Amino acid sequence: MPRLSPPIETGLLWTLLALPGAFMTYRYVQGTTFYGEYLHATGELGARLLIVTMAVTPLRMMFGNAAWTRWLLGRRRYLGVAAFGYALLHAAAYLQRQSFAVIVEDAGELALATGWVALLVMLALAATSNDISVRQLGRRWKWLHRTVYLAAVLTFAHWILTAFDPLPGAVHLAVLAALEAIRVWKAAGLNREVRSS
């Protein structure tokens, strides 16, 4: 089976990542989807894409240099930017719905503040998810992109604190924590092998 050229493959991937958001937004604008449903759906999809983005390294450690893990690694930036895009739709719906006074008042509450800080961190990550930023920032780029862990903790804190039922958010957080535990465990094993060799 012939492989797609990189531009076509990238375009198809972006289309697949954007389609759910376009469909949800269309239904929301048409009034078919209610505000609460749209807010939940965009936030949940953004959080799930964030998990997939962060799962790439643990999966490579678990399954090695398989073709599908290499494919994921090469598209990790796209997944991260898409996660930010859905977080932005989530925030835009809230801003469109609430008055300025309510927005200012809510921003001081932990449940909402965690979401805003997570969005700002994800904005910085999305804005620097390109080769130009990698070259310009040098070692600082890797340091900056480690703040994805902060964004993840804040994202799931926001989900758990604002949800009527915190269990789904807690389950997603547990999945991410398990993947990160595997990453740390595998990395520690590799370090021991290096020291003993």
State each model region's role.
Residues M1-S197:
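Membrane-embedded alpha-helical bundles that constitute the cytochrome b-like, heme-associated redox core
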